[in-house]
Amino acid sequence: MSNNDETVLGHLADHVFKHSGPIPESFVEVKGIDYSKPDAIDMRASDLIKSMKTMGFQASSLGQACDIIDEMRAWRGKHIDELDEYSRKGSFDENGFQKSTIFLGYTSNLISSGLRETLRYLVQHNMVSAIVTTAGGVEEDIIKCLAPTYLGEFTLKGAALRDKGMNRIGNLLVPNNNYCKFEEWIVPILDAMLAEQEAYVAQQGKDCLGVNTDVDSPIWTPSKLCDRLGKEINDESSVLYWAHKNKIPVFCPAITDGSIGDMLFLHTFRASPQQLRLDLVADIRKINSMSMEASQAGMIILGGGLIKHHIANACLMRNGADYAVYINTGQEFDGSDAGARPDEAVSWGKIKVEAKSVKVYADVTTVFPLIVAATFANGKKN
């Protein structure tokens, strides 16, 4: 070997075989699941997620999401007897200790999908404090009590489906007759709500329309409408039914953006000159007040857009959430709210600097059933 060759090899060794520095003790070794071991057979969901935490990529984020949810559920503060009157707000467990107020947000397509049953489980068992969804998240829950949604294909042609009166949501199909049944069901309820509103106004005077401090008054808000629909449907398969039964508010700031908006629009003609009113401002006061009164606040956001921002902005009123789990497929390069990572919300004061937060980049229907199985439904009581 010539001196020149030795020089070249020396340079290459410096570049290619550069020595690593000391490995920090905090580093975790990447490991997967060894299915040849007996304890990997018929694993519990919680054990599966625990094993996935060291896989890397979104598997690790999934494990982190479960840890954060477990922590927000397990947190306990002072007993109510230790608090002054002003501090006796927020959420408390059955023993009277402060617990996290958990805001659950989900987009309408998730109710259209089979994830509805998972979401209903959380509400049925009082595992969340408040819900934010879109109009479809309200109406599709009711519609599924009236008629089924079917599996289809992503590739089905829109023109052919239109001829058959079939509406496609991804690879789901909703017959248009379902919406006709929804109209038949909801119109008498809207009529009754309008009659109650007008009777109240006649009794109290028109000035009562500007005041909405009485929770039981028929000056309607989107959350009161959702509660009424849950009461009227009286079906245990419904998310709204259990929200009504357990007094969990369902906020829908975009209540008119869907079939229910169509029903409200048509009702303005049927009921004219009387008009059913929905007070959005009363609802923003209600959700923001819930956030401000929370001892600890957690966000579980399934999807993006309005439902994500509405909860995050409510948490701004308390200088940020203490826990945040985002699950969606959005990317941040387009500046969208859906794509934004939790750290962007930190810059706005919507998540605390010291908060536990993670974003899982995944289809919610793929990973959230696993998360619920490993946390809310793992048999451990929080």
From Swiss-Prot:
<feature type="binding site">
    <location>
        <begin position="108"/>
        <end position="112"/>
    </location>
    <ligand>
        <name>NAD(+)</name>
    </ligand>
</feature>
<comment type="similarity">
    <text>Belongs to the deoxyhypusine synthase family.</text>
</comment>
<comment type="function">
    <text>Catalyzes the NAD-dependent oxidative cleavage of spermidine and the subsequent transfer of the butylamine moiety of spermidine to the epsilon-amino group of a specific lysine residue of the eIF-5A precursor protein to form the intermediate deoxyhypusine residue.</text>
</comment>
<feature type="binding site">
    <location>
        <position position="309"/>
    </location>
    <ligand>
        <name>spermidine</name>
    </ligand>
</feature>
<dbReference type="GO" id="GO:0005737">
    <property type="term" value="C:cytoplasm"/>
</dbReference>
<feature type="binding site">
    <location>
        <position position="304"/>
    </location>
    <ligand>
        <name>NAD(+)</name>
    </ligand>
</feature>
<dbReference type="InterPro" id="IPR036982">
    <property type="entry name" value="Deoxyhypusine_synthase_sf"/>
</dbReference>
<keyword id="KW-0520">NAD</keyword>
<feature type="binding site">
    <location>
        <begin position="329"/>
        <end position="330"/>
    </location>
    <ligand>
        <name>NAD(+)</name>
    </ligand>
</feature>
<feature type="binding site">
    <location>
        <begin position="335"/>
        <end position="337"/>
    </location>
    <ligand>
        <name>spermidine</name>
    </ligand>
</feature>
<keyword id="KW-0808">Transferase</keyword>
<protein>
    <recommendedName>
        <fullName>Deoxyhypusine synthase</fullName>
        <ecNumber>2.5.1.46</ecNumber>
    </recommendedName>
</protein>
<feature type="active site" description="Nucleophile">
    <location>
        <position position="350"/>
    </location>
</feature>
<dbReference type="GO" id="GO:0008216">
    <property type="term" value="P:spermidine metabolic process"/>
</dbReference>
<feature type="binding site">
    <location>
        <begin position="134"/>
        <end position="136"/>
    </location>
    <ligand>
        <name>NAD(+)</name>
    </ligand>
</feature>
<dbReference type="GO" id="GO:0034038">
    <property type="term" value="F:deoxyhypusine synthase activity"/>
</dbReference>
<keyword id="KW-0386">Hypusine biosynthesis</keyword>
<feature type="binding site">
    <location>
        <position position="140"/>
    </location>
    <ligand>
        <name>NAD(+)</name>
    </ligand>
</feature>
<comment type="pathway">
    <text>Protein modification; eIF5A hypusination.</text>
</comment>
<feature type="binding site">
    <location>
        <begin position="139"/>
        <end position="140"/>
    </location>
    <ligand>
        <name>spermidine</name>
    </ligand>
</feature>
<dbReference type="Pfam" id="PF01916">
    <property type="entry name" value="DS"/>
</dbReference>
<feature type="binding site">
    <location>
        <begin position="363"/>
        <end position="364"/>
    </location>
    <ligand>
        <name>NAD(+)</name>
    </ligand>
</feature>
<dbReference type="InterPro" id="IPR002773">
    <property type="entry name" value="Deoxyhypusine_synthase"/>
</dbReference>
<dbReference type="InterPro" id="IPR029035">
    <property type="entry name" value="DHS-like_NAD/FAD-binding_dom"/>
</dbReference>
<feature type="binding site">
    <location>
        <begin position="344"/>
        <end position="350"/>
    </location>
    <ligand>
        <name>spermidine</name>
    </ligand>
</feature>
<feature type="binding site">
    <location>
        <position position="262"/>
    </location>
    <ligand>
        <name>spermidine</name>
    </ligand>
</feature>
<feature type="binding site">
    <location>
        <position position="257"/>
    </location>
    <ligand>
        <name>NAD(+)</name>
    </ligand>
</feature>
